């Protein structure tokens, strides 16, 4: 039997009791890969778009009620969680990506009809309480790698020790279509700050 913490809180509140829940701050959930403009070699552009989250913690983290609220939108559901030091993939069309991903990687689709902007935009991840967990403002120029802009590679965060809000911390994946749900191909090639 699984007991949901929020159900217990609701029950306590119903009977006039109260308690305070202090949830850990998960600064270690990061946007780690963006495939915003796939190559036509893969097929239809929007079928292969994805975002990847990476959990730097040594324990699984529930994404229940976390959200993506700019770029694309998605509110995560109760079953959505990221394994310890693992990945979570958010896709435009999961059917396409499932052919590339390791079979055990958790995933979901973002809201229907949306796609990532091919020239750049802000991608925002928010915790369940609305606080900012991570944000990346990517572009296809101004210091950002240009190969991920329709040439096949994804945009990969180069190292978990680098600030992922900086263009210099991102590079082009070495593989067509990137590495959804797996370690980034560029990891270990740059010195963390």
Roles of regions detected by a PLM:
Residues 1, 189-193:
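Disulfide-bonded cysteine-rich modules in secreted/extracellular proteins
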Residues 1-19:
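Alpha-helical segments with a strong preference for the paired helices of cellulosomal dockerin domains
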Residues 20-167, 172-179, 191:
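Activation on beta-sandwich/Ig-like modules and their edge loops
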């Amino acid at each position: 039997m699984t007991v949901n913490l929020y159900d217990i809180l609701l029950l306590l509140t119903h009977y006039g009791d109260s308690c305070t829940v202090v949830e850990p701050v998960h600064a270690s959930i990061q946007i780690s890969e963006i495939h915003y403009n796939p190559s036509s070699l893969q097929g239809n552009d929007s079928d292969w778009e994805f975002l990847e989250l990476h959990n730097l913690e040594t324990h699984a983290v529930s994404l229940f009620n976390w959200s993506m609220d700019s770029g694309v939108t998605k509110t995560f559901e109760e079953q959505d969680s990221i394994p310890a030091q693992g990945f979570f993939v958010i896709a435009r069309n999961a059917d396409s990506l499932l052919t590339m991903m390791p079979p055990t990687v958790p995933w979901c689709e973002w809201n229907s009809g949306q796609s990532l902007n091919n020239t750049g935009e802000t991608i925002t991840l928010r915790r369940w309480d609305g606080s900012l967990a991570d944000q990346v403002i990517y572009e296809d120029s101004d210091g950002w790698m240009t190969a991920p802009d329709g040439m096949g590679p994804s945009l990969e965060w180069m190292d978990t020790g680098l600030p992922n809000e900086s263009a210099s911390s991102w590079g082009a994946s070495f593989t067509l279509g990137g590495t959804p749900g797996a370690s980034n191909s560029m990891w270990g090639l740059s010195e963390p700050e």
